[in-house]
Amino acid sequence: MLLEKNIPFKYVFGKIKYEITFVAVYAIFITVIYKAYELTHINIPFAVPSILGTVISLLLGFRSNQAYDRWWEARHVWGAIVNDSRTFARQLVSFTPSANNYVDSNLEAFKKRMINRQIGWCYCLGKHLRKQRTLQGLEKYFDKNELAYLKQTDNKPAAIVDLMARDLQLALDEGWINRFQQIELDRTLTRLCDAMGKCERIKNTVFPSTYSLYIHLAMMLFIILLPFSIIQFVGMFEVPLVIAISACFLLIEKMAIHLQDPFENKPTDTPMTAIAQTIDNNLTQLYLLNAAKEDRQTLSIFENYIENGIVFDRLDTSSNNRKNKSNQQQKEVKDDQYYVL
């Protein structure tokens, strides 16, 4: 996507270079013929191209609005994907038990697996909409069995959502989350699936080709008639004037054409890869910070127990101390060991 405010002049007019070349050649040809053969009797009233230009302006304005609405809806949907992805990760780390009251390697693997899947889903959806290789470069987010399953499916983003829904049911069966938490997480997945459907609707809904054809034909007619209307007033300046007026209409038309398809891997596209990278950074940081917080909580509780002498005690190596502790506690212990009082 174009992010710079100052777009190069070459880039802008590079989009209409062939059309402008045709207009320039045609305008020069009309000027030469008009002067060489003194075709002053060929005179088209200026009102004709004026009315035609007004109609074209209205049609181009309508088309530009429709194209921008499609582009803005695509950006709005991906903004919702960002929010729901963060919500999903937050729910995962907050709903599931923390390390200080539930220690289970399978639980930690579940949280990491779900967050990796969500990150991979965002990248995969962008590639899916652009009709690229959807799983290329995403091997680190899925294990071998998941990749083998995804390769067998046609709609890989939908298959990833299905994998996450199955894991939510597993978490419910294992007791890692309760029924209410499972419903809330499933609602977030449903919103993500809805966003995917909206993107696919925009992608697969083609802008009416007849509408574009009629506008283009009207513009060509306008360009053909315009030199005959102004050459008698401006003479040789007809060439740059026709080029300038035509360029305005052509640029607006090209802008609408590019905006109407926001998932075609063009500079004017919705920046899906950049958005997915933002989600990747946010979710990875959230998971790592939560894991570090749990480690600190566990260490803090451990140190607190040691300071208060509640759980752990250090045995002395001297025989007297061992005898005293043996009399007091009446328990058999070993040297240089920790034991529970």
Per-segment meaning from a language model:
Residues 1-80, 98-102, 234-236, 281, ...:
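N-terminal juxtamembrane/topogenic regions of multi-pass membrane proteins
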Residues 1-9, 60, 77, 106, ...:
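Juxtamembrane loop-helix boundary motifs flanking transmembrane segments in multi-pass membrane proteins
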Residues 62-70, 75, 79, 158, ...:
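Short helix-terminus and kink motifs of transmembrane alpha helices
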Residues 71-88, 185-196, 202, 266-272, ...:
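Intracellular alpha-helical coupling/juxtamembrane segments of multi-pass membrane proteins
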Residues 85-119, 263-312:
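Solvent-exposed, non-transmembrane helices and loops of integral membrane proteins
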